[in-house]
Amino acid sequence: MKSVKLGGFTSITGLNVLNPERIQFTCEPSLDFTPTFYKEGDYVVAILPVDATLTAGTYNMTLVYGGSTQTLSLNVEAKDFQSSNINVSSTMLNMYRTSETISAFEKVRTELTATSSDVRYFSGSFLSSPATGATLLRGFGREIVLNGDTNNKYRNNGVDFALPSGTNILAANDGVVVYSGILDYTGCMVVVDHGFGVKTWYYNMAKTSVSVGDAVKKGDAVGTAGNTGFVAFDSTGVHIAMSVGDKFVCPYDAWDDSRDYGKIIIWGIDD
């Protein structure tokens, strides 16, 4: 039985599948996600996110293709997400964190996560830091309470880094730019599609350095550190998130300094 912590991700692979789009997937209890399978040589591959808000326990997945049925069990382990109270100005809240600015971001997020390249651009580890000298401020999954108001809180969907203004922000892995622009909520933002449903998101930058359609390599600059949009830290820097499909996930296992895998494992291919 595979195990994965809340907020993490794993992969499902198969052989002898000519039409991966015909794979039927169900899960009990629900994972609130239907994976997309992509061709990788003789294999089909799906990256499966485990949302941080799910309940720990055993999830029984059933996959049907043609006349074949396979049942897989996934052990979802609990994870203790810490909480922080952050004080931000009323100006910051009223300008950048409103129902309107969040809705505008959600619209873009929904559009971007609806599709992904069927080419796997990523390989090996993802960068654990956006630049030399970056300081990790707050990690994935932390509950952020704003100004002590428990009715105004959110779960950090990525990792916050402090960096001097203007420092180049580096792409975490190879991919293609699918968004480069500015939103009130995220500020200057770039989104890179790494293929197979995996994307990285770069918020709060001073400016972007790439355009939609640009191919980037791991370590290429996508923008510069700044503090645009809604910023819940007292410095310049960048917020970096990773998503699989429409779920934001913890990137740590894919980082080059991970104590575990250090990359996205495609079972049967990369393990």
Please identify what each model-predicted range represents:
Residues 1-80:
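Cationic-aromatic interfacial patches
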Residues 63-65, 181, 194, 220, ...:
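Conserved "cap/hinge" positions at secondary-structure junctions
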